[in-house]
Swiss-Prot record:
This is Ribosomal RNA small subunit methyltransferase A. Specifically dimethylates two adjacent adenosines (A1518 and A1519) in the loop of a conserved hairpin near the 3'-end of 16S rRNA in the 30S particle. May play a critical role in biogenesis of 30S subunits. PROSITE patterns: RRNA_A_DIMETH (PS01131), SAM_RNA_A_N6_MT (PS51689). It comes from the Bacteria. S-adenosyl-L-methionine binds at residues 13, 15, 40, 61, 85, 104. GO terms for cellular component: cytosol. The keyword Transcription does not apply. GO terms for molecular function: 16S rRNA (adenine(1518)-N(6)/adenine(1519)-N(6))-dimethyltransferase activity; RNA binding. SUPFAM superfamilies: S-adenosyl-L-methionine-dependent methyltransferases (SSF53335). Pfam families: RrnaAD (PF00398).
């Protein structure tokens, strides 16, 4: 059986440990009624456990060598291998209803994968898998943590994020230079934020662009130098001190100011 050569340009680190693959597959045990999309299956170490568990599985794999391997070794995947870039897929065309996402995510695009999951949050009730330990810690971090950032806030607005366990670099081929971790995100019951969602994203991103400064300084690119709301106590804080609810409050303050500013121009 010819094995696939890992490609550095694609961020490929193939998982070798079957026990860990089984534990990752088990994170979707409560979602067996929904279709599953696996990102970056490589040589199918995780794939085999998802199929054994009876999941309605589709995989997306950019590496044609891996696609050939999967076609040869996983007959159950016939017609279910998408040889494309996950980041460019229109997922709503693939899945008209809800579906779950799982994978041993390519390390070079893991953050981009989660931003895309957010775009389909109403269709994706659960997303789990393996990524760099540092990124997993950042996604699961709470207010007050040095690792709390843009993705932490945006994901936790819509998902309960669980850091499940750490994985040694020794269980991969080739071994990455960093440790990995398994993360699980389960959609919370929030239907809306209570503010404009697009502006919420802009506010979060703007505030963290200068994370060491107080919001009074970091929000100037959006609100200008002389916003009268800077007198409010919330602007004394740094972005990592704010909860998701406080970011909603900050968004409402920003929206009011920007609408007034637009009205003054007219």
């Amino acid at each position: 059986m010819r094995l696939v050569k890992p490609k550095k340009a694609l961020g490929q680190h193939f998982l070798k440990d079957l026990q860990i693959a089984q534990r990752i597959a088990d994170t979707l045990d409560t979602f067996k009624s929904l279709p599953v999309l696996e990102i970056g299956p490589g040589m199918g170490v995780l794939t085999q456990f998802l199929l054994e568990a009876g999941h309605d599985l589709t995989v997306v794999e950019l590496d044609m060598e891996s696609v050939d391997y999967l076609n040869q070794n996983f007959p159950d995947l016939k017609g279910r291998i998408i040889a494309e870039d996950f980041l460019k897929l229109d997922l709503s065309k693939l899945f008209p209803g809800q579906f779950c996402v799982i994978g041993n995510y390519p390390y070079n695009i893991s953050s981009q994968i989660f931003f895309k999951v957010l775009d389909y949050k109403d269709q994706i009730p659960c997303c789990s898998g393996m990524l760099q330990k540092e990124v997993a810690e950042r996604l699961a971090a709470g207010p007050g943590s040095k690792t709390y950032g843009i993705l932490s806030v945006l994901l936790q607005a819509w998902y309960d994020v669980e850091y499940l366990f750490t994985v040694s670099e020794k269980v991969f081929d080739p071994p990455p230079k960093v440790k990995s971790a398994v993360l699980k995100m389960t959609r919370n019951d929030r239907k809306e934020l209570g503010c404009d969602e697009k502006l919420f994203k802009t506010v979060v991103k703007t505030s963290f662009n200068q994370r060491r400064k107080t919001l009074r300084n970091s929000m100037k690119p959006l609100l200008g130098k002389d916003c009268p709301d800077y007198a409010l106590p919330i602007f004394d804080k740094r972005p990592e001190q704010l909860s998701m609810e406080q970011f909603v409050e900050l968004t409402l303050i920003s929206q009011k100011h920007l609408e007034k500013q637009a009205g003054d121009v007219l």
